[in-house]
Amino acid sequence: DLVRSRGLGDVYKRQAILILEERQHALARGAKIYGEILGYGTSADAYHMAAPHETGRGAAVAMRMALGKAQAYGVSPAQVDYINAHGTATRLNDKGETLAIKQVLGEHAYNVRISSTKSMTGHLLGAAGALEAAVCAKVIETGVIPPTINLDHPDPECDLNYTPLRAVQADVAVTMSNSFGFGGHNACIMLRRFA
């Protein structure tokens, strides 16, 4: 067994897969539904090849688009319970994302639990968004909000609740996951508890 011979056997016991299917199909086959996609948003601000816009402009556009679609299902910005931040722990990204969250959620931004699971996984590049969406589904299912580990000395300009150091329990019905990329590419997806 090539995988076990290289010591990777345990890696394959801890994986996630997202299956996206229509509600009627999932219900007909008796699938366990971990969450329902409320909406998504994408933007490309093309501000800089590697740096995000300092005001979070492009990120805010993607988040607003996702929220706009969620509002069609009766979900308001004040109902967002958890955000899985892009959170790469770089000064420009974290400050820009903080500003974007504040622009989009207003005062509610201070009530939302936020964490960066990249603090535990590292940056998974093209796989990051899928894993972080799966994390959001598990947060909805379990009510366990993962921590942002190693957040000992947060930047004073990043003053939201980034769930430092320890996981917390909370009732979570609506989540948002942010993914930003080089060249100003921004994406946001929102999930909610299936009822």
PLM segments and residue spans:
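Short glycine/serine- and small hydrophobic-enriched flexible loop segments
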Residues: 3, 21-24, 65, 134-141
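Acyl-CoA/ACP chain-elongation machinery
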Residues: 6, 40-54, 87-94, 111-161
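Short beta-strand-to-turn element immediately C-terminal to the catalytic PLP-Schiff-base lysine
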Residues: 18-22, 93, 190-194
